[in-house]
């Protein structure tokens, strides 16, 4: 029965599919919002006519892409589908809680969308800083609805994190240690730990903001002995681990894709990859104030946060060079998934380099809140996280559906997307260096050229998104059934065929220990 299967599901594959579909739909909404932003900035003068509505669109774009596209697809979609299969578990540890984690997201999304329908909407930026997010600058229910939306999304992620940690630690076959699990499983576990430790801090911060707005507390109001900078510390203590939460599962997927299409049976430097992810996870918690170099911190504090931020480049570099070493000497298959992975490595590295530039507190004081920052994090998100999602999707699509994509269309899609995102975000480095500030709906004529090129690029990306919908339709309509998958001995998730049966590993898997 349809309702029993899809509403009350306790099956990790079905819930993973729900996450995928929800994330894809939210991704369309987020893309639409980004097109509105680039349409407004395509030429000087005003299109939407109102700075408040522009900022509402920018804020919604960020929230939708982060909480309803990247996280549901990477952690909820790929995580649910692949983690139990990769460790030989029959399902997740808490299957009903898994269902609840998913069904908290649509109401959360509804609250976010409704926040833009009441009063003037929440035009605060995704950081929701007071006093702009206070009840004076944002009277009405908009920001409150946004806060409740974040609460629900946060509870969803925390429950999911508990579920993944328990599953990965507890549900492996007795014979295998944690250091024999695939890198994607490691990446999801580390991501889950980051979620578990960082989200409660965000919840605390936005709950205090909620009481400041509605119950006359003064946590962030100097008039009552509060401090708006406290909010920034609480937010970024969550916000920085969050950006690693968005990219770590991508690291795991890229490791699998690069290994597979290089014809290797294991990635280069497995232990180094694991330790690099653990280091990134740990360091992600002790660098948060690099988002706050302009609030007037002591020089020694700035020196610490600059150095600590630069240290993160080391484990990240370990990962990049290990991917390149995995490619080395391989029998490389230029499949669409491999193209996405290679694009990821190249563009993520560029994003990482601009991150090193921004980690210098003195430089950041000039570049903070300019388009240089926008360019930086879109290189690691729009070309890091999204490329990893696309690579993972085209790689595992036969596993999820049992059908094959059209290779030629998939490669064309990659090419259009690659051109589009680079044309959109590369010029923004120049805008930032020339001093164009973020979160403004208009700009002096001097910035016209690069903005126009950037907006053209965004429409090319939109074309790629629409083409992707066609490619998925084409695959599901043509029904080219998967015949056989090579290398299943080192890729456990493919062992049960494509697609795998509804229940897998109902009896505990017997793992023969090969290294003894």
UniProtKB/Swiss-Prot annotation:
Topology of this chain in the membrane: Multi-pass membrane protein
UniProt: Cu cation binding residues: 240, 290-291
InterPro entries: Cyt_c_oxase-like_su1_dom, Cyt_c_oxase-like_su1_sf, Cyt_C_Oxase_1, Cyt_c_Oxase_su1_BS, Cyt_c_oxase_su1_dom
Sequence positions that bind heme a3: 376
Stretches of the chain found on the membrane's Mitochondrial intermembrane side: 41-50, 118-140, 213-227, 287-298, 358-370, 434-446
Top-level EC class as recorded in UniProt: translocase
Main location: mitochondrion
Descriptive protein name: Cytochrome c oxidase subunit 1
Gene (name only): MT-CO1
């Amino acid at each position: 029965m349809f309702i029993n299967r899809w509403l009350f599901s306790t099956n990790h594959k079905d819930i993973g599919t729900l996450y995928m579909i929800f994330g894809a739909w939210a991704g369309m909404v987020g893309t639409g919002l980004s097109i509105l932003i680039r349409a407004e900035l395509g030429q000087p003068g005003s299109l939407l006519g109102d700075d408040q509505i522009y900022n509402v669109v920018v804020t919604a774009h960020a929230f939708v892409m982060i909480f309803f596209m990247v996280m549901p697809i990477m952690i909820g979609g790929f995580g649910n589908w692949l983690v139990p299969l990769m460790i030989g578990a029959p399902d997740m540890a808490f299957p009903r809680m898994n269902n609840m984690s998913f069904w908290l997201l649509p109401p959360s999304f509804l609250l976010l969308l409704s926040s833009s329908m009441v009063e003037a909407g929440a035009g605060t930026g995704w950081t929701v800083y007071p006093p702009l997010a206070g009840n004076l600058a944002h009277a009405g229910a908009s920001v409150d609805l946004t806060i409740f939306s974040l609460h629900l999304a946060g509870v969803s992620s925390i429950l999911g994190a508990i579920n993944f940690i328990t599953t990965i630690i507890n549900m492996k076959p007795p014979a295998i240690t944690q250091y024999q699990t695939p890198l994607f499983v490691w990446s999801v576990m580390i991501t889950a730990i980051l979620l578990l430790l960082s989200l409660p801090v965000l919840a605390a911060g936005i709950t205090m903001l909620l009481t400041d707005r509605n119950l006359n507390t003064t946590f962030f109001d100097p008039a009552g002995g509060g401090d708006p900078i406290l909010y920034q510390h609480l937010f970024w203590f969550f916000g920085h681990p969050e950006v690693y939460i968005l990219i770590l599962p991508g690291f795991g997927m890229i490791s699998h894709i690069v290994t597979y299409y290089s014809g290797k049976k294991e990635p280069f430097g497995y232990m180094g990859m694991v330790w690099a992810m653990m280091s990134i996870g740990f360091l992600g918690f002790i660098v948060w104030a690099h988002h706050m170099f302009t609030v007037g911190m002591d020089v020694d504090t700035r020196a610490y946060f600059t150095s600590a931020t630069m240290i993160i480049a080391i484990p990240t570099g370990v990962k990049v060079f290990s991917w390149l070493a995995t490619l080395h000497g391989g029998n490389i298959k230029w499949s669409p998934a491999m193209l996405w992975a290679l694009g990821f490595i190249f563009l993520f590295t560029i994003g990482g380099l601009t991150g090193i530039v921004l980690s210098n507190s003195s430089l950041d004081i000039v570049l903070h809140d300019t388009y240089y920052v926008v360019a930086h994090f879109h290189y690691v998100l729009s070309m890091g996280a999204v490329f990893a999602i696309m690579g993972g999707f085209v790689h595992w699509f036969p596993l999820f559906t049992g059908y094959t994509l059209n290779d030629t269309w998939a490669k064309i899609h990659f090419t259009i997307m690659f051109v589009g995102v680079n044309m959109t975000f590369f010029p923004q480095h120049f805008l930032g260096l020339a001093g164009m500030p973020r979160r403004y709906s208009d700009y002096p004529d001097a910035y016209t050229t690069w903005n126009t090129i950037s907006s053209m690029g965004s429409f090319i990306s939109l074309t790629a998104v629409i083409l992707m919908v066609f490619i998925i339709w084409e695959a599901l309509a043509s029904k080219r059934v998967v015949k056989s998958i090579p290398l299943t001995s080192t890729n456990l998730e493919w062992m049960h065929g494509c697609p795998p049966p509804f229940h897998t590993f109902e009896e505990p898997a017997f793992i023969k220990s090969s290294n003894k």
